[in-house]
């Protein structure tokens, strides 16, 4: 934050977004806004490094269990990597309580939002949604949705089907949120949209940002069948040393630094 214009304050990632990182997203489509999980969850267990929530979604007849666990990652010498203090493992278990087979192929995991943390920050330089698929990083800024000389305006996008989708997320100049699916939880789509966010520390000035969700694998569930999805979520600083050290566990995660691209 520009200390000449904005008083010092703590930064909360995704603060101005009403939806939480790791929330379930339904009906992901390029033609309409998705719906979000409104299940009322209850905490059922807690340890020193994890918490488990459970709830029932009557509209979809799904019993849902979500466990958030701190996820320290070690290097080859057994030392915990500093960047892993910003990692959480999310495990989602779904139980189909319907008497019918359910098709959940348009479901996803919400990756939160990113936006400038000061109104003086360049609007289209550092804020991106991004994804890594087929060995390369793709990223777009908020104006991608407003159109220009060579493109038309779009309210939202659903990218895919994508090959080998290893991660997706959002980033601002200093912070990033990255969804990292385990192999069995890899999907092939990424949903993104542009949104205006108020900066509370700057008299609620609106700034443009981006929002992202990652699709789950094509999923059908028989009655009383349980499916489990697992994602590691990095929510922390865009600090090259942290991300570079995590490359061994999460290949190419440091590509979001994109030196020489911006």
Please give the residue ranges for each predicted region:
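Soluble non-transmembrane domains of integral membrane proteins
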Residues: 1-259
